[in-house]
Regions:
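Intrinsically disordered, low-complexity glycine/charged-rich regulatory or linker segments
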Residues: 1-156, 281-423
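Gly-rich Lys/Arg/Thr-decorated short loops/hinges at beta-loop-alpha junctions or inter-strand turns
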Residues: 43-46, 166-179
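Beta-strand cores of modular interaction/reader domains in eukaryotic scaffold and signaling proteins
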Residues: 78-83, 107-108, 165, 203-207, ...
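Conserved beta-strand elements of beta-rich interaction domains across eukaryotes
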Residues: 84-89, 111-114, 169-171, 210-211, ...
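A short acidic (Asp/Glu
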Residues: 88-94, 117-120, 175-177, 214-220, ...
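Active-site cores of enzymes that catalyze phosphoryl transfer or operate on phosphate-rich substrates
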Residues: 147-173
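Conserved Class I SAM-dependent methyltransferase catalytic core
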Residues: 177-232
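Class I S-adenosyl-L-methionine
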Residues: 218-273
Length: 423
């Protein structure tokens, strides 16, 4: 088993790798424990607190992430969702846009699982009654032919996407230690397609994992340079023990000469990996200040170190808690506290409450006002947009870190735009 090294946070990296080795000793038991200690696990289960029936947990993540995109366009837009199956992000986007009466042109692409119908089975069922159904496609984003076909479609028509999401990942349950290096080629593929197909002023959401290696840090640097606003968040509904985080980038500046050269190089790197899966990606830049950690600009490094270190420490604390529970052979779940967590989350994001859950668990039910449907969703989102706009103005006055979530989730990583060739 190949183990990667860290160029930042050596102590935290060593501790996290130690804990992940403990997890690898008993992955089956860990699968149970990680769900038990997750504060918002009850949002999505057989009988869930939330009344919405999501295709996957990604639905709830996208509900949270979309709040960071406010204000949303009040006219139909084009959206592209990469590595999307089974379709949670698309379902959430439809949920968000439906009250506005807008019919966006939505396309979802994912790796085919046996057949097209199996890959998109749940989204095909859910979207049957949507006014505007998404265009569903299959394809391997790691193959140049697939990438070129997608990019050609968006560049040929001159109608690029306002929103692009990349939620790709793998089953890391057999090897938690090498998430970052294994996920890197897919992350690069999604970034390449996204930046080629995104319209000026558009937004991108991209899932990443650990941030210990130079290529991952360089990806963050690129997003910082080519977007007007950039942050990293971990949604509350993302399981606390995993490493997944999301880049949320707004106000895309477009593809200039420097970015075009960079994306062409990334295409070549992915092609090399496709030929030889053992190909090790050491850097995305051969020259310039960004080619080495020591020469990256201090503003970026400071913001990165403060924010990412908090993500890591939070993850370490939760994993240690899970391992302690796993070793004690006493897997205890506090249903009432976890239910209260989910109810609070549903209130925050205006998700209706499921009465059946409270009845089946013999818990006190919330009042009927809290189980109301999304009829007032539009007005609620408008009021929240105004509030968030005020926060954005404050951010531009002082472009440092901003806390998007309460503990135990660390603050988001926010940076203001600088030009791509600005070191």
């Amino acid at each position: 088993m190949e183990e990667h090294s860290s160029i930042v946070f050596p102590l935290e990296f060593k501790e996290l790798m130690r804990l992940k080795k403990e997890i690898d000793k008993n992955p089956e038991k860990w699968e149970e424990v990680k769900r038990v200690i997750n504060p918002l696990e009850f949002a999505s289960c057989d009988i869930a607190v939330a009344k919405v029936q999501p295709i996957s947990r990604a639905f709830f993540k996208m509900i949270e992430l979309s709040e960071k995109l406010n204000p949303l366009p009040e006219t139909p837009v084009r959206t592209l969702h990469l590595a999307e199956a089974p379709g949670g992000f698309v379902q959430a986007w439809n949920w968000i846009r439906k009250p506005l009466g807008l019919t966006d042109e939505t396309t979802a692409i994912s790796l085919e699982k046996t057949t097209f119908d199996i890959t998109w089975k749940r989204l095909l069922e859910v979207s049957r009654f949507w006014f505007s159904r998404p265009t569903l496609q299959t394809g391997d984003l790691m193959k140049k032919e697939t990438r070129d076909t997608i990019i050609e479609e968006y560049t040929r028509e001159k109608i690029k996407a306002w929103l692009i999401t990349g939620d790709g990942g793998f089953d890391f349950s057999e090897d938690y230690q090498n998430q970052e290096t294994k996920a890197l080629p897919l992350i690069l593929s999604q970034m390449l397609i996204g930046l080629r197909c995104l319209d000026k002023g558009g937004c991108m959401i991209l899932k990443i994992f650990d941030c210990f290696t130079l290529p991952t840090i360089q990806i963050l640097w690129v997003f910082c340079k080519v977007f007007g606003e950039f942050r990293i968040v971990k949604p509350d509904t993302s399981r606390v023990c995993n490493a997944e985080k999301y880049i949320i980038a707004k106000d895309f500046k477009g593809v200039d000469k420097n970015l075009d050269i960079f994306l062409t190089k990334i295409d070549g790197i992915i092609n090399e990996y496709e030929k030889d899966a053992s190909f090790h990606i050491e850097t995305l830049f051969d020259t310039g200040p960004i080619s080495k950690w020591d020469t990256i600009d201090e503003h970026f490094k400071t913001s990165f170190e403060i924010s990412i270190k908090r993500f890591i420490n939070t993850q370490i604390n939760w994993i240690q808690k899970g391992i302690d529970m796993m070793n004690s052979d006493k897997i205890i779940e506090n249903t009432k506290i976890k239910t209260a967590n989910v109810v609070k989350w549903c209130r925050k994001y205006h998700i209706p409450i499921n009465r059946e859950y409270f009845e089946s668990h013999r818990l006190c039910h919330v009042n009927r006002a809290e189980e109301a449907s999304s009829l007032s969703y539009h007005s609620l989102r408008q009021s929240q947009s105004q509030s968030q706009n005020q926060n954005h103005r404050i951010f531009y006055q002082k472009p440092v870190l901003k806390s998007d979530q309460q503990e135990p989730t660390p603050p988001a990583f926010l940076l203001r735009h600088r030009s791509f060739d600005d070191s």
